[in-house]
From Swiss-Prot:
GO CC annotation: cytoplasm
Pfam families per the UniProt record, alphabetical: Urease_gamma
Annotated gene: ureA
Protein name: Urease subunit gamma
Entry superkingdom: Bacteria
Species the sequence originates in: Bacillus cereus (strain ATCC 10987 / NRS 248)
Enzyme class, broadest EC rank: hydrolase
Length: 100
């Protein structure tokens, strides 16, 4: 199987998000990389499902809460930018204050 660097990056996001979801299900609070992975994964999948940029920006704010993450993590993540592929091309989705 031959993957482009972009496809490898997306695959790594999926694996990291899967691990993070498993830890969350076990009741563990998420760290910084786990939080970023879950939000990024949901944005990429939302774009694949046909949601537009505005919908994804709103979705990104409702994926995780401060109760889901370790102390201080919500304050560390002020913005997340995800380059997502839409039917009409690639667009940058920015989520401001994704965890509150």
């Amino acid at each position: 199987m031959r993957l482009t660097p972009r496809e490898i990056d997306k695959l790594l996001v999926v694996v990291a998000a899967d691990l993070a979801y498993r830890r969350k299900e076990r009741g563990l609070k998420l760290n910084y990389p786990e939080s970023i992975a879950i939000i990024t994964y949901e944005i990429l999948e939302g774009a694949r499902d046909g949601k537009n940029v505005a919908e994804l920006m709103e979705l990104g704010k409702n994926i995780l809460s401060a109760e889901d993450v370790m102390d201080g993590i919500a304050d560390m993540i002020s913005d997340i930018q995800v380059e997502a592929t839409f039917p009409d091309g690639t667009k940058l989705v920015t989520i401001h204050q994704p965890i509150h």
